[in-house]
Amino acid sequence: MTAVQLPDFADELVAAMAARDTNRAEIPVIQPAEPFLDMAGEDLRRRIYLTENENGDSLCLRPEFTIPVCLGHIAGQVGTPRRYSYLGQVFRQRREGGNEFYQAGIEDLGETDTAASDARAIADAADLLGQLLPGTGLTITIGDQALFEAVVAGLGLPAGWQKRLIHAFGDDAALARMIESLASAQSSTVEESELGELIAAGDVTALAEHIGTVMEETGYSSHASRLPEEIATRLVEKTELEKTRLSDTAFAALKTFLSLDAPLSEAVDMLRGFAEDAGLASGPALELFAARVEGIKASGADLSSMRWRAAFGRPLDYYTGLVFEISANGAVLAGGGRYDRMMTLLGATEEIPAVGFSLWIDRIEAARNAKERGQ
């Protein structure tokens, strides 16, 4: 395997990140696999290089930096707010390009001013790219998972459907399939039997007792599979989802929201108009979005290069709010977002707000080379 060399601008980039009040994180290449498998999303999970140690523990080659930076912060019991920077190789199976490549980035942990830290993440990523690619036109696409979650909740869907739709956010094809299935009536698969009656009634406790009795009578051990309570909960949820249908009004509202696309400078007014037309309360998600836009303006960033798309998400399960990508000539050079729930899921004893971004070093290098060739 040919070694992947650091680009000639690596030292410049490291210095530029350090100048932004960051602490350099040194992350081992070999990582415990479980946190990535649990939180990284299907797109990344299927690209991870997995192995085991002699104790049978699942390990992997480092597929990204955000999760291990957070784990390192928790293990070090370091106070917040604290900003980390990194530059190193990541390892992923890819259809195009090498399977090992460099990423750099900044993770901002513990800053309680959400709007300001969101704006700073976008500005830092854009400024670093501007330093490495002077004179190159950058396009910034912004989305917000919290806005989508608020709209879905406002439509009154069952929790199971909300969870499914939120999980699919960022995967346009999967989301479209779910919305279409919600718009059409579905036949129930519940059988006419005692089990079927319990499922249809939605009585999880009675259903779990019935399943437990059947498992005992058949000698089926719950240690080999899920517990009766888990099975009962899933069966009731599945039936509830099958019976759910979006009203024509709610379906139209969801489709309209996902079609919203505007320059960032016009996005807040567009969102307020949508909420009024759809009969939805503006709520904290919209107010935070508006505050973030004001924070971006206050940072002196050029809003003319920024566009908001309601349907825009990124294929990582840990995002909770802001998501963004920065492109040049059709190539995505940076991406990031907010992941406020991840720190507690990884073991932090208190909630720690977090936002960050990664730079794709191989793509930046290709863009620099193309610029030098005058392409």
List the predicted regions and their residue ranges:
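Acidic, His- and aromatic-enriched active-site or binding-groove loops in soluble protein domains
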Residues: 46-55, 156-188
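Internal, well-ordered domain-core segments that constitute the primary functional module
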Residues: 103-173
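Beta-rich nucleic-acid/ligand-interaction surfaces
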Residues: 27-46, 143-153, 312-320
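A conserved hydrophobic position in a structured secondary element of the catalytic/binding core
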Residues: 61, 143, 359
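Short secondary-structure junctions
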Residues: 22-27, 46-50, 305-306
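Polyanion/phosphate-binding surface patch
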Residues: 29-59, 84-85, 97
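Short amphipathic alpha-helical patches
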Residues: 37-41, 152-156, 171-178, 188-193, ...
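Positively charged, Gly/Ser-enriched RNA/tRNA-binding surfaces
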Residues: 2-21, 31-32, 64-78, 83-135, ...
